[in-house]
Amino acid sequence: MATKKYELTKEYFFHGEFWHQLDDNKGRFSARIEYSPYHGLILDYCISDSESPRTCEILYGVLNTGERCTLIGKFDFTQGNIHFGKGIIHTGRHGFPIMLFNDFYAPDSKIEYCDLSLHGLQEFIHPHGFFTQLKHLEHPIFIAKGNHWTLQLVNHVSFSVIGDDLLNIINCQNKAALENIIHQLKKTKELYPDAFFSIRKELVFYFRIKSSNDLGIKDHISKCWDISGLFSILLNKPTLPEEINIKFKGNGSKTPCLLTTGFEQRTIDLALREIKHQLLPINRKHINLGKIFCKWFKIAERYMPLTITYQYETGFRTLHQAHTDIILFATQLEAINKTIGGSKNEKYMKPINEYASLFLIQEIEMFFKKFNNKSIGENIATLRNELAHVDRKK
């Protein structure tokens, strides 16, 4: 059965009934769930039953779409509005971080794998409009292994039924060649009368994340953010999760997931802006993704401030943001220098010489030559110190 698609950059609204015991729905109450990428998940509730929970870690529910769902968070319904009369009624709006579809899941439910698709990933892999050049692969395109983690780049293909109408969509200027193909197809159909043809409709790439020590939902989602954070740097723009689908052990189908993210509208617009494979600063042809992810999983936490800067980019800069970014980037250069064994005197230039392209180095040199003839390293150090200390002359 096909998994229903829930995209994290779109808006959704649901009505449903909810309760807090996995095997007992007494004390259930009515609520509306609102989801948007900028406000996240919000439960708009009305509780009148004395057996309904006042606080809980998890809620189970059925939606007006006919789906089961599991809401994960810390729910405290005593913090909303309380109405007194013939009974006590609790109402309010309560945010929560995670919503799972299709079934009821206990907090300790075991995960087989988690599938992540990212905005821009398809274009990063191959130019849009030329996907017929690619073959569907049953095996992973690459496998990267980290500490207790395995990451695979896999593809999924969907087909549309065409049957005997396959002959109607084939054409060739060489009439003899066309007649030969039609003849061979008819002959094949005679040999295999039960054969039923379909044509590829869509080929989609996504990451598959597996844990070797049964880590939970929040750990898998954290790893999703590590992956999208790296792609934000590679693509030089916010790269947001498009879909997250979790495969629980013992469950026949994957479970869609919505998350509270809290992105600004300008960040979402920038993330959804169309990109071109040929114009990207880096695409799949330029790098070894498997090797990069093996290293990234070891250092992702250290560079979280940098990835967050890229992921929450809006395309606009205030003076405060510009100053903050300069200090942050200088600090990251120092961290990279330490990683590659550079000395204190080369803390800015060694990382640049090691990893920057000649074009980038020339652009930085041209910028600083407007002000002086000092080296790039000296100018970065001066600029960083001017901004980091209030009393320094700017």
Which role does the model predict for each range below?
Residues 1-228:
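Long, contiguous, compositionally biased segments that the model treats as domain-scale units
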Residues 31, 151, 231-232, 296-297, ...:
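Generic hydrophobic, helix-prone segments enriched in Leu/Val/Ile
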Residues 196-270:
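Basic/polar, acidic-poor N-terminal "presequence/leader" segments
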Residues 2-5, 248-251, 258-394:
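Amphipathic, oligomerization/interface secondary-structure segments
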Residues 117-119, 124, 215-216, 236, ...:
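Helix N-terminus capping/helix-initiation residues
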Residues 66-68, 73-74, 148, 236, ...:
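Glycine-centered secondary-structure boundary/capping sites
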